[in-house]
Swiss-Prot record:
Cofactor: binding details: May bind 1 zinc ion per subunit.
Protein name: Protein translocase subunit SecA
Gene symbol of the encoding locus: secA
Cofactor: Zn(2+)
Any matching Pfam family: SecA_SW
InterPro entries in alphabetical order: Helicase_ATP-bd (IPR014001), Helicase_C-like (IPR001650), P-loop_NTPase (IPR027417), SEC_C_motif (IPR004027), SecA (IPR000185), SecA_CS (IPR020937), SecA_DEAD (IPR011115), SecA_motor_DEAD (IPR014018)
Entry similarity comment: Belongs to the SecA family.
Residues holding Zn(2+): C884, C886, C895, H896
GO biological process, one term: protein transport by the Sec complex
Protein's membrane topology: Peripheral membrane protein
C-alpha cells in the first residue's frame, strides 16, 4: 500500500528535488552566457575579476554576481584545467555558496565544484578557507587549483604542519587558503595566546568550505583540539594524597569495574575530610565545596590508581617509569601517558619519580570553531544519514545533488556467518575468484588490526598478489588507492584510508603521469610516453569494465551507516558498473550489540552448518535498525558534550574578545582605571557594610586591603574618627588618593611606556588566570556527574558553578592587575614582548585514540643525537627554551640563540 506521503512525493517531488529544481533557472542563465564568455581573450576573461570587485564596491551583492561569476569560473576551468563543470556541478556550487552541504557521490568532481563557490566568495576579499582532512590533500588541491585562481588574478595559500608564523600569516592573507581542520583550529588557539595583534596569523572567519564534511564535523568532532604546556611540580601533593588511600576500608568506597569508575561512600568522604583537614588541604566545611574541586579530582585519581589499575596488567614499572599496557594488544606503549593527573597518581602509588603533568593552556572543539564562520558549507558523498545533526548543531541543510550519470552499482544482500573465521575464509574465496576473472577488488576493514589479520590469512592460503593500505601515510596511500581500479588488483584498506582520491577503472591517469613523467624534459619523448600511458589505461579500463567494474567487499558493518555508504560509494563512480557486498559474522562488534546469542541459536535451529551463510533482506533491515540506534546514541552523546562545551565556549569568547580589544586599543589607561575603581569599591563595601555604625567598620582590614592592592598607606583610622563621616566619603578619598598615585606614575613613565606596561600586565594576568580556570572547569566537569545521584541536574549545576568560577576569575583579574600596576617599577631597557609558554598541540583520533599531531615533526627538526655540539650547521631548528646543543648547560635563547636575535 502506498502511503499518503509517497503519493505527495510522486505528485510534487521530495523537498530535496524541489530545492535542486529551484537552481535550474540560474543554470540556464549561466549556460546562456557560455558562448559570449568563450569568445573573450585570456586577458579579458582574467580582467572580469577586477570588474566584479568594482561592482561589489558599488553596492552589488555576491548573489547578484553569481551568474556571470560562475560563467567566468567555468570558462577559466575549461581553459586552465581542461575540465568544464557539468550542470549538476553548477548545482553543487550553488548549494555551497548558499551555506549548505552538497552531498555528491564519489567521482562527481567535488574538488572542481568547490572552485566555483570559492571564486565567487573570494571576490569579497575577506578570505575563503577550503578545509581538508590531511596535509597531502591540502597541498594537492592547492597546487592544482592555484593555476585556475592565479589565471583569474586571485592568490592561493596553503597551511600545513611545520610552517612558521610568517609563512602562515602570508597564506591566510591570500584570497583563498587551503588548510587542514587541525591546523586551522590550532592557529586560532595560538593566535589567542599572542601579545600583539601583529603576531597573529589568522585574519577572521569569513567563509569555509569543508571537504569530507561528515568526517570533520561529526567524526573528528568527538575529541577537542588541545594546546598544553608543562605544569609546576606538584609531587608533594600527589604523595600526600596517595598515603590516604591505604588508610581506607572497603566500606569507604564503591568500585565499578565495568564502567571503570570509583566513588567514595559517605563514611569514606567523612574519613577523607578529617585526613585532609589535618593535612591543611581542605577549604571550607565539605569536601564537595566548590573550592575543593581540584582536591576531589586528585583524590578520585588516587583511588582509581589503587583500586582500578593493576600492576603488570594495566601497566608495568620499568626503569623508574610507569609504562602503559594496551588492553587490546597487550603491547607496551612507551611514551604514552594517562591524562588529567591519572599517570601521576600511578607514579605516586608505585613510588617512582613523578613527572610534571601537562596543563591545558587552551582548547576548542571543532563544533565551536567552525560555528564562528559567518558562512559555512560542506561537501561529502555521505551526509544524509547525519542530516539531523548538521541541522541541529551547525544550522546546515543537507542537499543531495543528482549524479551526472545513473548509478549502475549492484548492492548485494549481506552474508552472515556464525564465526569470524568462517567469514574470512569466505572472503578469501571470493577475492581469489574475482582476481581470476580480472575484476579489481577493494576490501574494506574497520581497523588496522583486521587488515593485517586478513592479509596474514591470504598469505597463508598462498595468495600474495595484493596491497595493504592503512590510514597512516597519506601520499603513498593516495597512489595505491588511485591504482586500485586496475584489472585483477586486490587492495585491502581501512575504511578511512585514501580519502579524497578516486578509484578510476584502469588506473588514475593524472597520478600515473605525475609519477612516471617526473623529471622528463618537454618534447617528443615526453609526448610519446604520455600517449602510451593514456592508451594503456584505456585498454585496462575496458578490461575492468568487462569484468564487472570495481568489487567492494566489506568485512564488517560499521556503527555508522554513513561509513558503510562511503565504502560502497567507492564503486560505480560516474556511471561505471560495480558491485558491493558485506560479509558479516555473529562475532562482529555490531552483531554483538544487538543480541547475537539469540540469533546464533535461531540460526542453529534453521540448520545452518559451519561455513554456510544466511542471506536475507530481513537481516539487512535488522542491522540497519541496530545502526540507527547506535547513531542516535552517539548523536546524543555528542549533543550532551556540546552542551557542556558551550558553557566554556561562551566564557572563551568573552576572554578572547577582551584580549583582542586590549591588543587593538590605543589607550589602556581607562580599562586599568575601571579595574582599580571596582577593586576600591569592593574593598570599601567589604569592610564598611551598608548602613553599619562606625563601630562596626573593619578599619584594620580596610587599611590592610589598601596596602595590599593599592600599595598606599592612607590615614584611614583618622578618617573614621571624623564626625559625620560616611562610607561614600571614605570611598571618594581612597579613589582620589589611588588615582593621584596612578597619574604620577603614568607621568613618570610617559604615556607610550605606560600603555605598553598596562597592556602587558593585563594580557599576562588574563592568560595566567584563564589557564587556571580551564583546569578548574575540567576538574568540576569530572565530578559534577555525581550530583545526579542527589536528584540534581549535573548540567545546570555545572552551568551555575562555572559561572561562579568565572565571576571569581574576573574579580581575581581586577585585583591582580591593580596590585601589579600600582607596584611596577621601570627598568631602563628596551621593552621586550612577553614570551609565549612552551606549547604542544594534541588532537586524538576518535577511533584509534592516537594523537594525530604526534606524528608531525617540525620543519628542519634534527634529533638531539644527530647534532654535533661543535658544528651549529648540524643543529637544525632549535626551540628557544631547549638546552643549547653546544653543551654549555644554558637554554638556547641565552647561549647561541643570542646571535640569532642580534
Amino acid at each position: 500500500m502506498v502511503s499518503l506521503g509517497g503519493i505527495a512525493r510522486k505528485l510534487f517531488g521530495s523537498a530535496n528535488e524541489r530545492r535542486v529544481r529551484s537552481y535550474k533557472s540560474k543554470i540556464a542563465a549561466i549556460n546562456a552566457l557560455e558562448e559570449a564568455t568563450k569568445a573573450l581573450s585570456d586577458e579579458a576573461l582574467a580582467a572580469k575579476t577586477a570588474e566584479f570587485r568594482q561592482q561589489l564596491a558599488d553596492g552589488k551583492t555576491l548573489d547578484d554576481l553569481l551568474i556571470p561569476a560562475f560563467a567566468v569560473a567555468r570558462e577559466a576551468s575549461r581553459r586552465v584545467l581542461h575540465m568544464r563543470p557539468f550542470d549538476v556541478q553548477l548545482t553543487g556550487a550553488m548549494i555551497l555558496h548558499g551555506g549548505a552541504i552538497a552531498e555528491m557521490k564519489t567521482g562527481e568532481g567535488k574538488t572542481l565544484v568547490a572552485t566555483l563557490a570559492v571564486y565567487l566568495n573570494a571576490l569579497a576579499g575577506k578570505g575563503v578557507h577550503v578545509v581538508t582532512v590531511n596535509d597531502y590533500l591540502a597541498k594537492r588541491d592547492a597546487a592544482t587549483m592555484s593555476k585556475l585562481y592565479g589565471f583569474l588574478g586571485l592568490t592561493t595559500g596553503v597551511i600545513v604542519h611545520g610552517l612558521d608564523d610568517d609563512q602562515r600569516r602570508e597564506a591566510y592573507a591570500c584570497d583563498i587558503t587551503y588548510a587542514t581542520n587541525n591546523e586551522l583550529g590550532f592557529d586560532y588557539l595560538r593566535d589567542n595566546m599572542k601579545y600583539d595583534r601583529a603576531q597573529m596569523v589568522q585574519r577572521g572567519h569569513n567563509y569555509a568550505i569543508v571537504d569530507e564534511v561528515d568526517s570533520i564535523l561529526v567524526d573528528e568532532a568527538r575529541t577537542p583540539l588541545i594546546i598544553s604546556g608543562p605544569l609546576d611540580d606538584r609531587s608533594d601533593l600527589y604523595n600526600t594524597i596517595d598515603a590516604f588511600i591505604p588508610l581506607l576500608s572497603p566500606e569507604d568506597y564503591e568500585i565499578d569495574e565495568k564502567q571503570r569508575s570509583a566513588n567514595f561512600s559517605e563514611d569514606g568522604t567523612e574519613k577523607l575530610e578529617n585526613l585532609l583537614r589535618q593535612a591543611g588541604l581542605l577549604k571550607g566545611e565539605s569536601l564537595y565545596d566548590i573550592e575543593n574541586v581540584a582536591i576531589v579530582h586528585h583524590i578520585n585519581n588516587a583511588l582509581k590508581a589503587h583500586k582500578l589499575f593493576t600492576r603488570d596488567k594495566d601497566y608495568i614499572v620499568r626503569n623508574d617509569e610507569i609504562v602503559i599496557i594496551d588492553e587490546f594488544t597487550g603491547r607496551m606503549m612507551p611514551g604514552r601517558r594517562y591524562s588529567e593527573g591519572q599517570h601521576q597518581a600511578l607514579e605516586a602509588k608505585e613510588k617512582v619519580q613523578i613527572q610534571p603533568e601537562n596543563q591545558t593552556l587552551s582548547s576548542v572543539t571543532f563544533q565551536n570553531y567552525f560555528r564562528m564562520y559567518e558562512k559555512l558549507a560542506g561537501m561529502t558523498g555521505t551526509a544524509s544519514t547525519e542530516a539531523e545533526e548538521f541541522g541541529n548543531i551547525y544550522g546546515l541543510d543537507v542537499i543531495e545533488v543528482p549524479t551526472n550519470l545513473p548509478i549502475q552499482r549492484i548492492d548485494e544482500d549481506d552474508e552472515v556467518y556464525r564465526t569470524g573465521e568462517e567469514k574470512f575464509l569466505a572472503i578469501i574465496t571470493e577475492i581469489k575468484a574475482a582476481h581470476e576473472r580480472g575484476q579489481p577488488v577493494l576490501v574494506g576493514t574497520t581497523s588496522i588490526e583486521k587488515s593485517e589479520l586478513l592479509a596474514h590469512m591470504l598469505r597463508q592460503s598462498g595468495f600474495t598478489d595484493f596491497q595493504v593500505l592503512n590510514a597512516r601515510y597519506h601520499e603513498q596511500e593516495a597512489y595505491i588507492v588511485s591504482q586500485a581500479g586496475v584489472p585483477g588488483a586486490v587492495t585491502i584498506a581501512t575504511n578511512m584510508a585514501g580519502r579524497g582520491t578516486d578509484i578510476q577503472l584502469g588506473g588514475n591517469v593524472d597520478m600515473r603521469l605525475e609519477r612516471e613523467l617526473e623529471g622528463m624534459e618537454p618534447g617528443p619523448e615526453l609526448d610519446a610516453k604520455e600517449a602510451a600511458i593514456r592508451a594503456e589505461i584505456k585498454v585496462l579500463k575496458e578490461k575492468a569494465l568487462a569484468a564487472g567494474g570495481l568489487y567492494v567487499i566489506a568485512t564488517e558493518r560499521h556503527e555508522s551507516r554513513r561509513i558503510d555508504n562511503q565504502l560502497r560509494g567507492r564503486s560505480g563512480r560516474q556511471g561505471d558498473p560495480g558491485r558491493s557486498k558485506f560479509y558479516l559474522s555473529l562475532q562482529d562488534d555490531l552483531m554483538r550489540i544487538f543480541g547475537s546469542e539469540r540469533m546464533d541459536s535461531m540460526l542453529q535451529k534453521l540448520g545452518l552448518k559451519d561455513g554456510e551463510a544466511i542471506v536475507h533482506p530481513w537481516i539487512n533491515k535488522a542491522l540497519e535498525r541496530a545502526q540507527k540506534k547506535v547513531e542516535a546514541r552517539n548523536f546524543e552523546t555528542r549533543k550532551n558534550l556540546l552542551k557542556y562545551d558551550d558553557v566554556l565556549n561562551d566564557q572563551r569568547k568573552v576572554i578572547f574578545d577582551q584580549r583582542l580589544e586590549l591588543m587593538e586599543a590605543d589607550n589602556i589607561g581607562e580599562t586599568a582605571a575601571d579595574m582599580r575603581h571596582e577593586v576600591i569599591e569592593a574593598l570599601v563595601t567589604k569592610h564598611i557594610p551598608e548602613n553599619a555604625y562606625a563601630e562596626q567598620w573593619d578599619i584594620a582590614g580596610l587599611k590592610a586591603g589598601i596596602a595590599q592592592f593599592l600599595n598606599l598607606d592612607l590615614p584611614v583610622e583618622e578618617w573614621a574618627k571624623e564626625e559625620g563621616i560616611a562610607e561614600d566619603d571614605i570611598l571618594q578619598r581612597v579613589t582620589e588618593a589611588a588615582d593621584t598615585y596612578a597619574a604620577e606614575r603614568a607621568e613618570r613613565f610617559g604615556p607610550e611606556i605606560m600603555t605598553y606596561v598596562e597592556r602587558s600586565v593585563i594580557l599576562q594576568t588574563i592568560d595566567h588566570l584563564w589557564r587556571e580556570h580551564i583546569v578548574n572547569l575540567d576538574h568540576l566537569r569530572s565530578v559534577v556527574g555525581f550530583r545526579g545521584y542527589a536528584q540534581r541536574d549535573p548540567l545546570q549545576e555545572y552551568k551555575a558553578e562555572a559561572f561562579e568560577l568565572f565571576q571569581s576569575l574576573l574579580t581575581n583579574l581586577r585585583e591582580a592587575v591593580t596590585a601589579q600596576l600600582m607596584r611596577v617599577e621601570l627598568v631602563q631597557q628596551e621593552p621586550q614582548q612577553p614570551e609565549l609558554p612552551e606549547m604542544t598541540a594534541h588532537h586524538l583520533d576518535p577511533v584509534t585514540g592516537e594523537d594525530e599531531m604526534a606524528q608531525g615533526v617540525p620543519a628542519a627538526f634534527v634529533p638531539a643525537e644527530e647534532r654535533d655540539p661543535n658544528n651549529p650547521a648540524t643543529w637544525g631548528r632549535i626551540g628557544r627554551n631547549e638546552m643549547c646543543p653546544c653543551g654549555s648547560g644554558k637554554k638556547y635563547k641565552h647561549c647561541h640563540g643570542v646571535y640569532e636575535q642580534a
